[in-house]
């Protein structure tokens, strides 16, 4: 029942990549170059097999917006094995899904995905490891709110503060 990150692989391809979508993926061209990267590169098939094995073993996956990730790799993970912070922090009274960045700022007091806020395409602008750790911390925070009987109050606070800050962490003032 250990809740920790266990896969840190990047998928390489032999096909030419037209756009790395760095502002969303955090990936730079060197990251997927086997001669230059410090990342563990695996094929799509290997990544799929790892996920399939973990799914078959009954592992639970914790993340933010996992449905899209699973759809991209073309794998079905039973809903009972998915803990998605998009769903955990969704209020039936509000149609909006909350971003990982906003949830991390509001609940964890961490400003993640800083390159996204600045519109900067830099390696540390978005980091899948940082996102995975934030989702894990948000899940633990959710469990804490649930244990303490404060879940409903916290959700009300989230949806009250969100519109005031346009659902984003306030901009930091340069010193």
Could you say what each language-model-derived stretch is?
Residues 2-7:
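Short, small-residue-biased leader/transition segments that mark boundaries at the very start
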Residues 8, 12-25, 29-31, 49-175:
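Metal-dependent phosphoesterase core characteristic of DEDDh/y 3'-5' exonuclease domains
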Residues 28-40:
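Short histidine-centered catalytic/ligand-binding loop motif
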Residues 37-52:
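A short, well-structured juxtamembrane/interface segment
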């Amino acid at each position: 029942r250990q809740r920790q990150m266990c896969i840190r692989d990047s998928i390489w391809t032999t096909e030419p990549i037209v756009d790395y979508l760095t502002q969303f993926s955090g990936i730079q061209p060197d990251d997927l170059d086997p001669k230059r990267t410090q990342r563990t590169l695996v094929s799509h098939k290997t990544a799929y097999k790892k996920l399939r094995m973990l799914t078959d073993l009954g592992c639970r996956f914790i993340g933010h917006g996992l449905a899209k990730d699973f759809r991209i790799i073309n794998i079905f993970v039973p809903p009972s094995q998915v803990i998605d912070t998009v769903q955990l922090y969704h209020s039936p009274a509000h149609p909006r899904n909350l971003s990982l960045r906003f949830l991390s700022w509001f609940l964890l007091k961490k400003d993640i995905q800083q390159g996204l806020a600045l519109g900067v395409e830099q390696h540390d602008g978005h980091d899948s490891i940082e996102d995975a750790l934030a989702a894990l911390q948000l899940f633990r925070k959710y469990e804490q709110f649930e244990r303490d009987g404060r879940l409903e109050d916290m959700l009300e606070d989230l949806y009250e503060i969100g519109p005031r800050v346009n659902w984003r962490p306030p901009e930091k003032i340069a010193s």
